[in-house]
């Protein structure tokens, strides 16, 4: 079965309507794009605007397949090896258009602008510097470039930005240890967490325990992916072995009530990405993503967009899907926003400001 791409406004047309436009349409519920929130699950290349991808490809002479041009957003189904290979290939092609420091700076500036337009006051963007190091002088120069670009983007937009350094689970665990040591060097200087991404089926979480132990000793959050393409066993490894503070996706935990209870007891946040789950075939429709079940079980949830470049839906769309497909009330949407803020690494002053804004959103007509 081919997964359907979630219906969404084009990424470039994601500007929230102003109050006059909403009134003209007769909308009576608050606009989720105006709801203050934190965005905790966004990948670096995957955050790029589609128009920027096309423009940079033309500038640098990179040929884009139809799936990234005329047929964008692509139809994906990554629950089998062939489908994941196609997804990863499209991601790698998109990454190849980022060839100069200015390209990286532009990506982060535009991403921060899009976050601000959708109510996100704090962003944690995930990057594996190994994928960019060859072009930018090595791992350390790449990390320093990303951190400097993040500071500039934050200053220009008012969005706080933290960086999560992520290891690739398809690479050797020793590579992950190298990245963990590098991430710790910049703890307190922009790096807030250490992650583990890519295909769960090709790298078990327990193989990376050493890297996560290094990161934890350095004061970084543990934020591995799990429970997306594999079931609750993968989530359990993240919780028990990697001592996860948050889990990227984690939706398959709902299949094991005992595990879900443990997640709730430990207050491990789940970074749930509805549009991505549908786009990759983890769920057939947005209504099948178990957001309501996780929420009612008491799990902390932080909605995320994952890779809007490939799924065509940014952060506000995730809240719209939860509202429309799962019947979340405005009070429940506000609680989801609060949970995203509390699960973040945002400084206390940003947390207080965003939480106050959530309360104001609920009471503003």
PLM features per residue range, with description:
Residues 2-5, 9-220, 229-234, 241-246, ...:
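Metal-cofactor-binding active-site regions of metalloenzymes
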């Amino acid at each position: 079965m081919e997964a359907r791409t979630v219906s969404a406004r084009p990424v470039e047309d994601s500007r929230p309507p102003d109050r006059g436009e909403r009134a003209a349409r007769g909308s009576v519920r608050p606009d989720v794009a105006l709801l203050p929130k934190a965005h905790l699950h966004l990948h670096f290349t995957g955050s790029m605007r589609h128009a920027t991808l096309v423009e940079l490809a033309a500038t640098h002479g990179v040929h884009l397949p139809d799936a990234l041009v005329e047929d964008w957003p692509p139809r994906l189904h990554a629950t089998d090896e062939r489908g994941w290979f196609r997804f990863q290939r499209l991601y790698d092609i998109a990454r190849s258009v980022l060839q100069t420091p200015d390209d990286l700076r532009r990506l982060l500036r535009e991403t921060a602008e899009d976050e601000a337009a959708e109510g996100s006051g704090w962003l944690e963007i995930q990057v594996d510097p190994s994928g960019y190091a060859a072009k930018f002088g090595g791992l350390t120069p790449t990390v320093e470039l990303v951190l400097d670009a993040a500071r500039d983007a934050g200053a220009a937009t008012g969005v706080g930005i933290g960086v999560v350094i992520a290891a690739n689970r398809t690479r050797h665990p020793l590579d992950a240890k190298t990245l963990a040591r590098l991430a710790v060097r910049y703890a307190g200087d922009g790096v807030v967490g250490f992650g583990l991404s890519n295909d769960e089926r090709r790298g078990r979480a327990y193989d990376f325990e050493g890297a996560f132990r290094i990161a934890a000793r350095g004061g970084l959050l543990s934020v591995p992916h799990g429970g997306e393409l594999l079931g609750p066993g993968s989530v359990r490894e993240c919780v028990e072995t990697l001592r996860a503070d948050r889990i990227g996706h984690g939706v398959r935990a709902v299949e094991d009530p005992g595990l879900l209870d443990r997640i709730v007891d430990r207050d491990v946040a789940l970074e749930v990405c509805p549009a991505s789950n549908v786009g990759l075939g983890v769920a057939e429709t947005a209504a099948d993503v178990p957001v309501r079940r996780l929420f009612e079980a008491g799990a902390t949830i932080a909605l995320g967009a994952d890779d809007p470049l490939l799924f065509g839906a940014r952060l506000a769309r995730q809240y719209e899907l939860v509202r429309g497909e799962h019947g979340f009330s405005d009070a429940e949407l506000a609680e989801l926003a609060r949970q995203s803020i509390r699960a973040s690494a945002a400084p206390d002053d940003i947390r207080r400001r965003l939480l106050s804004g959530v309360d104001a959103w609920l009471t503003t007509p």
